Design a protein with these regions (language model features):
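Conserved "landmark" site that anchors the functional core of diverse proteins
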Residues: 1-275
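Single conserved hydrophobic/aromatic residue that forms the stacking wall/gate
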Residues: 273-283
Length: 283
């Protein structure tokens, strides 16, 4: 069995580039450790499929503006996610396909355009990083996982270890790719806290009828939404607190719609705590 290692130098780290894997750090939320992992796990997994990796292999998540990476050894990569300019040694190359990067060449991922926020880079063999609680995903607030628990910085050195190829590398077909847009229609299942003891019928009608806008103060912990203020079916949270959104601690999931005060938040993979706020389910 031949095992090869690919060394990678981060010439430019980009706005927020981290190492993630899928499905992340599972089973520890009950003790305050969120799963982390990719925000857009479909694009992430498809990047791995393109280069012949298991869907779980560690790769790079790029937010807004991407990195420039020099490969000391020949490697196969794929770039997926939001549309962004991608070049190898200055020559434009497509996303969603396996690409060969020759030794000494530079893969450059530019800034996203008007559609989407995150881009994913997979390298055949997966990005090497030490596992912490069963995952290589970066959790920056906890300062663990990935590259020393932080975003990548200029000058960082990474590596990818390739075993003999056991999966077929392939182009990701157009109908397999997620459709990126500035307007998304989300499927919602009303959860137990959508009951009339918490929200009025008019609140639920507003939830389904409103075109919400994403607030600028959004990140991997959650996507805050701008929309109508709930009327609320009660004046306070009783023993749980003064605001009608307050409830006793309750389990939640990534993608749940949580009302913290009057602000709806789509919960992200790096949220720290069990939220004492009512929520509906989204998918």
């Amino acid at each position: 069995m031949t095992i090869t290692s690919t060394a990678i130098t981060v010439l430019r780290a980009g706005a927020l580039t981290t190492i993630q894997d899928w499905p992340g750090r599972i089973g520890y939320w009950k003790v305050g450790v969120p799963p982390s992992g990719p925000m857009d796990d479909l694009s992430f997994r498809l990047a791995n499929i393109a280069v012949g990796n298991p869907a779980s292999a560690a790769g790079l998540e790029v937010t807004m503006a991407g990195p420039a990476l020099r490969f000391d050894d020949t490697a196969v990569v794929a770039v997926t996610g939001a549309p962004a300019p991608v070049t190898i040694d200055g020559k434009p190359v497509p996303q969603w396909v396996p690409l060969t990067v020759d030794a000494g060449s530079v893969l450059d991922v530019g800034a996203v355009g008007s559609l989407g926020m995150r881009v994913y880079v997979a390298v055949a063999g997966g990005i090497d990083a030490e596992e912490y609680l069963g995952s290589r995903s970066t959790f920056t607030m906890g300062r663990f996982g990935g590259k020393d628990g932080r975003r990548l910085e200029d000058g960082d050195r990474l590596s990818a270890t390739s075993l003999p190829e056991v999966r077929t590398r392939r182009r990701i077909l157009f109908d397999e790719q997620p459709a990126f847009s500035n307007a998304w229609q989300l499927g919602v299942t009303v959860g137990p806290h959508g009951a009339p003891e918490f929200f009025t019928p008019e609140d639920i009608d507003d939830l389904f009828a409103t075109a919400y806008e994403v607030h600028f103060n959004s990140d991997r912990t959650g996507v805050r939404l701008i929309g109508p203020q709930p009327r609320w079916a009660r004046t306070d949270g009783g023993e749980a607190g003064l605001h009608p959104s307050n409830i006793h601690d309750n389990a939640y999931s990534v993608g749940a719609l949580d009302f913290t005060g009057d602000t709806p938040i789509l919960l992200g993979p790096c949220l720290l705590y069990t939220s004492p706020s009512p929520r509906d389910r989204t998918r």
